[in-house]
Amino acid sequence: MIEEFVEIEDTKHAGFAAAMEIYADAFPANTRFEVDLLRERIDKRLSCLYLGYLEDEVVFMALLWPLKNTEFILLDYIATKKNYRGQGIGTAFMNQINQMLSVINLC
């Protein structure tokens, strides 16, 4: 099962490139934002990128967008690496996020 979910606050982090590969594989081009736009949003803390690790490999990514001046957070994109799908990784992430939201400010 997944080892941990971590928020990446700096797109120079090694996991960012792996997350973008999962993102590109999971979503059709006409539904994706450009990587440069995502990089800018994450670096400016307008969006939050979470990665899921299994044996030091990034196997999951989620992009969250806290909506300004509201208490709402949009789960913009969520994806699991193709050969790890169907193992409950997305469910585990949703459970963790629900716990986090009950005690802290997410981003």
List where the protein language model places each region:
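N-terminal, well-ordered alpha-helical segments
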Residues: 21, 73-76, 95
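Conserved beta-strand in the GNAT
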Residues: 51, 56-66, 72-79
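Sequence-level motif detector for i,i+2 pairs with an aromatic at +2
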Residues: 1-3, 47, 59, 70
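Active-site rim helix/loop that mediates acceptor-substrate recognition in acyltransferases
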Residues: 26-55, 63
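Conserved acetyl-CoA-binding loop-helix of GNAT-fold acetyltransferases
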Residues: 80, 86-99
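Residue-level detection of beta-strand scaffold positions
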Residues: 3-5, 60, 75, 93
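Short amphipathic alpha-helix that is part of the acyltransferase structural core
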Residues: 1-36
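Conserved GNAT acetyl-CoA-binding A-motif
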Residues: 99-107
